[in-house]
């Protein structure tokens, strides 16, 4: 039991290191979109085909510190290797100065032997100079 716990801790630490590396490689958001003054993302995650176990929150981006990386973890605790990377869609929309845009993406993770069935829907609002 202790070995399994230790393995989980090491996996978590490795994921954090990988996340920092991806953030560093992405650069800063204000460098990619210099005239951006605010960004908020309304995130709504559901199971495909249903409304059970919904997750809904608003992510307000702190521009001074934000990497040009938009990854969201899957909220299903059983999901392995899942989550959503909406970086390209959001950066593309911000670079073209869109004030409001939305999108969705299915989780690519697995819950045991089956595919994760969660879907992320997001609405982003942005302001520019």
What are these regions (language model features)?
Residues 39-63, 68-110, 117:
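Short recognition patches in nucleic-acid-associated and regulatory proteins
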Residues 1-68, 121-129:
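Short, intrinsically disordered terminal segments enriched in charged and Pro/Gly residues
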Residues 107-129:
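Terminal low-complexity interaction tails
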């Amino acid at each position: 039991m202790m070995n399994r716990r230790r393995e989980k801790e090491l996996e978590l630490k490795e994921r954090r290191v990988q996340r920092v590396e991806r953030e560093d490689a992405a650069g800063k958001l204000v460098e990619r979109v210099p005239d951006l003054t605010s960004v908020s993302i309304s995130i709504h995650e559901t199971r495909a085909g249903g409304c059970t176990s919904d997750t809904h929150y608003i992510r307000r981006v702190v521009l001074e510190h934000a990497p040009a990386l938009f990854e969201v973890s899957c909220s299903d605790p059983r999901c392995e290797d899942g989550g959503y990377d909406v970086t390209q869609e959001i950066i593309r929309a911000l670079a073209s100065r869109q004030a409001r845009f939305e999108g969705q993406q299915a989780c690519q993770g697995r819950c045991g032997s089956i595919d994760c069935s969660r879907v992320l829907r997001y609405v982003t609002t942005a302001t520019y100079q």
